[in-house]
């Protein structure tokens, strides 16, 4: 791994089409995050087939332009990802949800998460969105990152989700105004 790989976040790009190789790499990132204890909608152990099925559905949403998918890649491959859920109800065309911000453990503490969030915010702004919302484990690294990036904490919901090991966890909702 070069000094550039260690010291700076890798470049972020938006995928408009997802290849089989990218599906496999995204699955690896998801499995690594769940193995590491991230509460991202899946229980441990997460099978490769379940992870792949999830990403195939995401790829379908990208193809239908219901989702925007961003990835961070280093010299080895995809190390992080985030999504914008663009397909909102008729009375909410101005907003999108930020979802599944995942960073492989080998790439953490390098600014990858922040770079992914900023890229998604910029794309949402360019798409005319003025409000983003998300949820995160209340006391987790992601919640601290969102607060540092200027997202407004709405508040926690006790026992909203489960950690991958089955333990209940509180979830905090955040929002970010893009027109301010």
What role is predicted for each listed range?
Residues 131-137, 152-169:
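Conserved catalytic-core motifs of GNAT/GCN5-like acyltransferases
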Residues 2-11, 15-18, 152, 163-180:
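Terminal substrate-recognition subdomain of acyl/acetyltransferases
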Residues 142:
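Helix-turn-helix
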């Amino acid at each position: 791994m070069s000094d550039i790989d260690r010291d700076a976040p890798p470049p972020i790009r938006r995928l408009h089409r997802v290849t089989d190789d990218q599906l496999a790499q995204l699955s690896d990132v998801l499995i690594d995050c769940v193995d590491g204890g991230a509460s991202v909608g899946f229980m441990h152990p997460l099978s490769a087939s379940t992870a792949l099925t999830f990403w195939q559905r995401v790829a379908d949403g990208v193809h239908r332009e219901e989702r925007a998918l961003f990835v961070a890649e280093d010299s080895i491959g995809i190390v992080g990802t985030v999504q914008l859920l663009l397909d909102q109800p008729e009375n909410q065309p101005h907003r999108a949800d930020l979802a599944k911000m995942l960073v492989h453990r080998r790439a953490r503490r390098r600014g990858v998460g922040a770079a992914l969030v900023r890229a998604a915010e910029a794309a949402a702004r360019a798409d005319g969105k003025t409000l983003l919302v998300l949820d995160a484990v209340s006391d987790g690294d992601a919640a601290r990152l969102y607060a540092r990036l200027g997202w407004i904490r709405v508040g926690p919901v006790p026992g909203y989700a489960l950690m991958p090991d089955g333990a209940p966890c509180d979830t905090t909702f955040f929002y970010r105004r893009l027109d301010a």
